[in-house]
Amino acid sequence: MIHIQHQVQLKPFNTLNLDVVASHYIKVQSVNELIEALDYAEQQQLNALILSGGSNMLLPQSLDALVLHIDIQGLEMIDEDSESVKIKVGGGQIWHDFVLMTTQKGWYGLQNLALIPGLVGASPVQNIGAYGVEVGEFIELVHVYDRSEKSVKTISCADCKFAYRHSIFKDEPYRYIITHVTFKLFKTPNLKLSYGDLLKAVGNEQTPENLQKQVIQIRESKLPNPKEYPNVGSFFKNPVISRQDFNQLLTEFPLIPHYPQPHDRVKIAAGWLIDQAGWKGKRLGAVGMFEKQALVLVNYANATLIDVQHTYRHVQSDIQQKFKLRLEPEPVLFGSNGLILSHME
């Protein structure tokens, strides 16, 4: 049985701590409740906005929509052998807590992704990644409610079309609602230590437990705690450009940090670009780029969505002018009707 609330303050439910009031709100704790809530939205002619951990969203001050807050819990062992486990996890589980649990159980693969904010159900949407690992590498199935077909279904890893910060769930944002995710994790560790200072930090103690510990320490040293400095983590994607364009850039900026990608492309460190453009630690009113990590936009003092847009567009403009590169924001921008807007609107 669903419980419908009205004029609900969403400030506690978005990590940027934006002041947002939703006209309608339902906490969803099962697939049946989700279906019932969607039927209600259809009857009331309301758009349904899916709220997960609120760590990748830019919301307006007023939402005339039905906010569905996904809080589906649970963990089920699907299969286990001597080499691996397959586990089905509720979309409402806190991502970091889930990663800690897998390490404690001796299930390996996700340690590089520790301390990423948000919930399990949101992890496939933008194929979350950090320190050389992406979650899509360990996803077996994504369990969804298909709003077009009005049915529950599973989507294989291959059909998720995972790419850098991308998936089919971004291509069709209104079609699928993720309820559970099935992961395949391994009992023998295969540590990925090639990214940045991770190898140095891990040192001689090359264990999954120490890897996770060092990832957490590195993130805590560079990234502000959203409870102290409201933020959505990395605000901009790292640009991926052609080798030809990169070589031209390298002649003018020989120290630019970069990472080879498939198909003769190169990923550029967006944080370095922002730092070089003078934005690290710089503020415009209530919003600024964090002093320890230029890639993180922070709400310092009760900022509104308009304040956030004003700041990140200034950053985009300066990067475009200096490097001839366009930075694309990671978080999704929503309009007052609960539908996704272009970042440039």
UniProtKB/Swiss-Prot annotation:
InterPro entries per the UniProt record, alphabetical: FAD-bd_PCMH, FAD-bd_PCMH-like_sf, FAD-bd_PCMH_sub1, FAD-bd_PCMH_sub2, MurB, MurB_C, MurB_C_sf, Oxid_FAD_bind_N
Enzyme Commission code: 1.3.1.98
Cofactor section: FAD
Keywords, ordered alphabetically: Cell cycle, Cell division, Cell shape, Cell wall biogenesis/degradation, Cytoplasm, FAD, Flavoprotein, NADP, Oxidoreductase, Peptidoglycan synthesis
Domain (FAD-binding PCMH-type): residue spans on this chain: 18-188
Subcellular localization, as worded in the UniProt entry: Cytoplasm
Gene Ontology biological-process entries: cell division; cell wall organization; peptidoglycan biosynthetic process; regulation of cell shape
Active site: R165, S234 (proton donor), E330
Keyword Cell cycle among record annotations: yes
Catalytic activity: UDP-N-acetyl-alpha-D-muramate + NADP(+) = UDP-N-acetyl-3-O-(1-carboxyvinyl)-alpha-D-glucosamine + NADPH + H(+)
Database matches in Pfam families: FAD_binding_4, MurB_C
Gene Ontology terms: cellular component: cytosol
UniProt similarity note: Belongs to the MurB family.
UniProt function note: Cell wall formation.
Protein name (record): UDP-N-acetylenolpyruvoylglucosamine reductase
UniProt lineage: Bacteria, Pseudomonadati, Pseudomonadota, Gammaproteobacteria, Moraxellales
